[in-house]
Amino acid sequence: ADMLLSLHVDGAASPLANGLASYHYGAGESSSTIGERLADLAQRELVARTGMLNGRVHPKSWALLRLTRMPAVQVEVGYLTSPLDRARLVDPAFRDTIAEGLLVAVQRLYLPKAEDPPTGVMRLPAIVA
């Protein structure tokens, strides 16, 4: 495998907690620059496509991110404890939107800067064709 993209749903004591957040390896002086770029692209694509609250990108030293020998990103795609996020997550069309956003983020990671389209405009048929 060339990269690891781990999808999670979060939970919180408050039903008001909601939104998306992405994580890459980073601790002190050490970090994954490719993981950080992928996390940033994923976060921007998902927020642009879903309109969900932007929980931003964060460096973490979690084992999943630290011990993986390839760029690794963990994306929290919402909170099951949030009625708003939960309603979105049970909708197959919303899950398709998440999948498309993540696929576009991976595609954009490998595009030369001159060919990189603006966030939120590249669509799945253009990638698959």
PLM features: residue spans?
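Active-site-proximal helix/loop segments of hydrolytic enzymes
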Residues: 1-129
